[in-house]
From Swiss-Prot:
Pathway(s) this gene product operates in, as recorded in its UniProt entry: Glycan metabolism; pectin degradation; 2-dehydro-3-deoxy-D-gluconate from pectin: step 1/5
Keyword check for Secreted: yes
Protein name as annotated: Probable pectinesterase 56
Family matches, as PROSITE patterns: PECTINESTERASE_2
Subcellular location: Secreted, Cell wall
InterPro entries named in the record: Pectin_lyas_fold (IPR012334), Pectin_lyase_fold/virulence (IPR011050), Pectinesterase_Asp_AS (IPR033131), Pectinesterase_cat (IPR000070)
Function description: Acts in the modification of cell walls via demethylesterification of cell wall pectin.
Provenance organism: Arabidopsis thaliana
Length: 288
């Protein structure tokens, strides 16, 4: 039952992306996203728990134990807790699913950053290079802070990815949608400078996108998409999302410039549709 719902989500992601980027006319029902949460946890292949009640106490141990080149979804259930780890999911760990107890309860946390000499690509708290990845009910964050510049929370560098009901928190360069087809549903994403960036074909539905208080002299920019060729079928699409200011930015939002995006490359493509956009966004919309 849980595996069927996971595959339904994969199908839905392809339908939506095909509709928005490849010209197909598709209107999939929202009921496709109906994961039976407890069933998914009950059928987990491995359990991670800080208190020792699972198979492992760290996420990295569970990822290492997952099979390589799997053709069926392999589920790792991560129980409530704070996991201070830098997690790397390699190309051979295909069809891996990470599911937590909630985006405010199961937290994956790191603090790698550019000021300390880490390249942006390598700074992610969670980096995924395998296809067929899914994350649900997790918080993924980078706590480096605005003064540390580039500090990625989540990097996705592969195809067929679904991020569902997750919180993705950082400041500059929060979410690196590096490549491939990616689908984000019911997520909460926060940041400051270029905090959703990359060259992926990414769809965001029913997501909360929240600009935070940036570092001194910085301008908030929600997106920096890097489509490099006019024939490339990539871009970012935001549908039925809510764009607003965080609690620390709200009192000063009149003094901080916040834009929907900037063209990172010549053929950058970003669309906001059927979404609420708060007055935190500059009237110009996009960077000059």
């Amino acid at each position: 039952m849980a595996m069927t719902s996971t595959m339904q989500l994969l199908v839905l992601s392809f339908l939506v992306i095909a509709s928005l980027f490849l010209g197909a006319t598709v209107a999939p029902p929202a009921s496709l996203i109906s994961t039976p949460d407890q069933a998914l946890k009950d059928k987990a292949d491995l359990i991670v728990a800080k208190d020792g009640s699972g198979n492992f106490t760290t996420v990295n141990e569970a990822v290492a134990a997952a099979p390589e080149n799997g053709v069926k979804p392999f589920v790792i259930y991560i129980k409530e807790g704070l996991y201070k780890e830098v997690i790397r999911i390699g190309k051979k760990k295909t069809n891996l699913t990470l599911v937590g107890d909630g985006r405010d309860l199961t937290v994956l946390s790191g603090d790698l950053n550019g000021v300390d000499g880490i390249k942006t690509f390598d700074s992610a708290t969670l980096a995924v290079d395998e296809s067929g990845f899914m994350a649900q009910d997790l918080c993924i964050r980078n706590t480096a802070g605005p003064e540390k510049r580039q500090a990625v929370a989540l990097r996705i560098s592969t195809d067929m990815t679904i991020i569902y009901r997750c919180r993705i928190d950082a400041y500059q360069d929060t979410l690196y949608a590096y490549s491939g087809r990616q689908f984000y549903r019911d997520c909460y994403i926060t940041g400051t400078v270029d905090f959703i960036f990359g060259r992926a074909a990414a769809v965001f539905q029913y997501c909360q996108i929240e600009a935070r208080k940036p570092g001194i002299g910085q301008t908030n920019i929600l997106t920096a998409q890097s489509r490099e060729e006019d024939t490339a079928t990539s871009g970012f699409s935001f549908q039925k999302c809510n764009i607003s200011a965080s609690s620390d930015l709200t009192p000063i939002k009149g003094t901080v410039k916040t834009f929907l995006g900037r063209p990172w490359r010549a053929f950058s493509r970003v669309v906001f549709m059927e979404s609420f956009i708060d007055d935190v966004i500059d009237r110009a919309g996009w960077t000059p």
